[in-house]
Regions:
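Alpha-helical segment of the N-proximal tetratricopeptide repeat
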Residues: 12-35
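Alpha-helical adaptor scaffolds
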Residues: 112, 117-118, 125-132, 151
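Non-membrane alpha-helical segments in proteins
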Residues: 26-31, 53-65, 90-93
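Alpha-solenoid HEAT/ARM repeat scaffold
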Residues: 26, 42, 57-58, 73, ...
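Alpha-helix N-cap/helix-start positions at coil->helix boundaries
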Residues: 22-23, 38, 53-54, 69, ...
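Amphipathic alpha-helical scaffolding segments comprising HEAT/armadillo-like alpha-solenoid repeats
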Residues: 3-16, 37-49, 68-81, 100-113, ...
């Protein structure tokens, strides 16, 4: 096969990842974008076991963009077993990309038990961006974020409430909470709440 043959190139990436060298693994994972998820899955799963934090983090990111059932299970395991908060945060982001409906409950549970600021910020940002997160999860996560001492999480809570403004069951409560937040002592929080209550441009 020629070097331009996709199968030949994929074989080279497999060899690089099998080498166990962190630099080679990082380069190889960066070249997986053109390949289908089923070809990438075993390579990314292998890199989750690497001792290098950056390799594990990049493997999580790759699994987010190459969703498979095995990848989803592996990411959920990383939420529980991974010791490094940077990797847990990346796993949370990646799992959210598999779909807000299936990721929302595991990520809400992770928020409750993992107090690291980066993990929590990643969860709030990831679920705020997903369209199919159940309204009940958004509401509970907003309450948790707004109760946190971290103003960045509080601002994320405002964004979550904004997502709920027009929900038939939770919209009235979300709008009332946003109205209350306009009088917050923190001008950033008050401004974010005020902006959320302004009429939205339909364009």
């Amino acid at each position: 096969m020629s070097d331009s043959d996709p199968a030949a190139n994929l074989d080279g990436l497999r060899q690089a990842i099998a080498s166990g060298d962190p630099a080679a693994r990082l380069r190889a994972m960066g070249c997986l974008r053109p390949y289908p998820a089923e070809d990438c899955e075993p390579l990314l799963l292998a890199c989750l076991e690497d001792t290098t934090v950056l390799v594990r983090s990049m493997a999580c990111s790759g699994l987010g963009y190459k969703p498979t059932a095995a990848g989803t299970r592996a990411l959920r395991r990383m939420l529980d077993d991974e010791p490094d908060p940077n990797v847990r945060a990346e796993a949370a982001n990646a799992l959210a990309r598999h779909g807000g409906e299936q990721a929302s409950e595991p990520l809400l549970a992770l928020y409750r038990r993992d107090a690291h600021w980066l993990v929590r910020r990643s969860i709030v940002a990831a679920l705020a961006d997903e369209r199919d997160v159940p309204a009940g999860v958004l509401a509970e996560l907003a309450d948790l974020a707004l109760a946190d001492d971290d103003v960045h999480l509080q601002l994320g809570g405002v964004e979550l409430l904004n997502r709920l403004r027009h929900d038939p069951d939770r919209g009235a409560a979300a709008r009332a909470r946003l109205a209350d937040l306009r009088s917050s002592d923190d001008h950033r929080l008050a401004a974010a709440a005020l902006e959320s209550l302004l009429p939205q441009d339909p364009c």
